Amino acid sequence: MLNIVLIIGLLAIFNTSSASNDVCHVTRKPLMLPAPGDVYKKAVQFYSNITAPRSTSVLAPVMSSLEVYINTTTTSAFAPAQSIKVADILEEDADAIRVKSIRMAGFIAQCIIFLFVYTIVTMDVEIWKINMDWLKIQYFQHFEDSAAEVPVFKLYMAREIQTCPLPARQNVMIVRQFMEMESNC
C-alpha cells in the first residue's frame, strides 16, 4: 500500500514539473501583502527627556534623538514588482535540467524498488503458509460435517490483553498521597 502511495506521489511530482514548461513562476510577480504607504514614513525617535522617580535608583541612559527606521515600503501593494535575479537558473540549458531530473527520478525509482523487494524478502512466508493451511482445514471440516459445532474459544482475561492498565483505586490513592506529600514540602 505504501508503495502505491509513493508511486502516485512520484507521478504527481512529475506532472507538476512537466506542467511548468521550464518556467519559474516565482519570478513573474511575487505576491506582496497590502499595506498603506505611510506605515514607516515617520522615523521613530528616542528622547532623553524622561525622568525617573527619585525613590528608585534606576539611571535612565542619556540618548540623543536617533532615527531607527527608514521608509522601505512601496506606496502600493499593486505597484509593479521588481525583477528577481535568476541568472543562475536561466544559464542552465534545458538538457542539463532534464539530465538532473532523470537522475533524481532514477534514484527515487531505485528506492521504491528496494523498499518493495525488502518488504517481499522480509515477509514471514512460513507462518503465512501454516495459517493458510489451518484455514483450509477448518473450512473443509466445516462443510464436511454440516451438523458440526463451531468451536468458540474463550477469550483471555482482560488483564492479559490490556497493554496499558487503567489506574485502579489503590494506584490513584497512592498518586494523590504522593502529590499531597510534595505540596507539603
Swiss-Prot record:
Alphabetically sorted, this entry's keywords are: Membrane, Transmembrane, Transmembrane helix
Q: What is its main location?
A: membrane
> Per UniProt, what is the membrane topology?
Multi-pass membrane protein
The residues that cross the membrane are: 1-19, 105-125
Subcellular compartments: Membrane
* A GO term from the CC aspect: membrane
**Which superkingdom does the taxonomy of this entry point to?**
Eukaryota
Tell me what this protein is called.
Uncharacterized protein C05B5.2
